[in-house]
Amino acid sequence: MKCKITNEQIKPFMSFGKMPAANGFLKEKDFKNETFYNMEVGFSEKISLFQLNKFSNPKIIHSTNYPFYTASSEHMKTHFKKYAIWIQKEYLKSNSKLIEVGSNDGTFLKNFTTTNIDYLGFEPSKTIADQASKNNVKTVNAFFNDANIQNLKKFHNKTDVICAANVIAHIPDLKNLIHTIEKLLSQKGVFIFEEPYLGSMFSKTSYDQIYDEHIFMFSVTSVKKIFQLFDFELIDVHWQKTHGGSMRYVVGRRNKHKVNDTVHKWIINENKNKLDDMESCLEFKKNCETSKAKVINSLKKMKNDGKNICGYAATAKSTTVLNYCNLNTDTIDFICDSTKEKIGKFSPGSHIPIVPVSHFHKNLPDVAYLFAWNHKDEIFSKEKEFLNKGGSWFSHVSL
């Protein structure tokens, strides 16, 4: 495989086997047409970048019915409100210009609708962009790229902040992304983005962060090296609790900003923990294999003991777990979810029925596999009755 930034040849260090599209929830009639790919991961030692070998076409992924709305999570709504307040305090002033990449249903940008900030969101999924527009959030239904910004002259070289959250790892052509940012940012403008953190994935063995839409897993070291190639520099970082451990990166034009000491401290820490080294990748591979065996054996014992098991939350991440561990309806009876686009369909590859959360409440199992472990606090507070009636939670990561 080739590094998607440097074009160097890199050797995959691990295969997760045959995988379907992570968000490819489907009807029974479509089982026979389901497609799979061999999901392998590699590591560029030149720029310390963890990356996927193959990925789905973003135009297909973000088609009309992309099944995720940010506003469905109270936790994320709170997080984005705090994110908006922080950006306003640190980087915006009266009449500043702001663009969000992958703005979803407008949950983040809604915080700017009553300000004098000149903002705009880019959202490629039509149904989600339409929802943002219904929420009176200014949104362009398009991918954020060089071709789609040509008519936005008032933002060219005048944008104070370009931001994104859990989006950049989904974009295969980072070069085009950075060139687009370069055209829009003012001389002292900043690009701020949040993504799940490689170090957190390694420490938790949360391999379900890897699927066809998550093309990259970033570290502070890799972000620094990538942007240096394009005359930008990493000027600040902030660790976040979201998604099991994420990092907020702040990037600016070279020599236009003071670089915060936290960047240097994180790079020293990553070097100490060998996040910039293939050795950590091979250790992660070993830990994944151990985790897989533990999941299979634990669930098998539960079934042998007569336990009823369901899945909670039909996440994209669950597709990796279910297919990597070869789980299906022999083990998991159903998966409950609140997303209407998924209910009545089946999980990709494993073909477990997706049912509404009300079905979970009416048919409380003995064990619930929490696939949305990164939202555990919000879910635990909603599902106290499950525990009170003797149920227990299970996951491949520590809860």
Predicted regions mapped to residue ranges:
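N-terminal juxtadomain amphipathic helix
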Residues: 1-74, 238
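A conserved beta-strand element that flanks and buttresses the S-adenosyl-L-methionine
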Residues: 160-163
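Conserved SAM-binding loop of SAM-dependent methyltransferases across substrates and taxa
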Residues: 105-116
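Conserved class I S-adenosyl-L-methionine
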Residues: 94-104, 309-312
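Short, glycine-/aromatic-enriched active-site segment of Class I SAM-dependent methyltransferases
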Residues: 193-216, 220-222
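Flexible, glycine-/basic-rich loop-and-beta segments that form/coincide
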Residues: 243-289
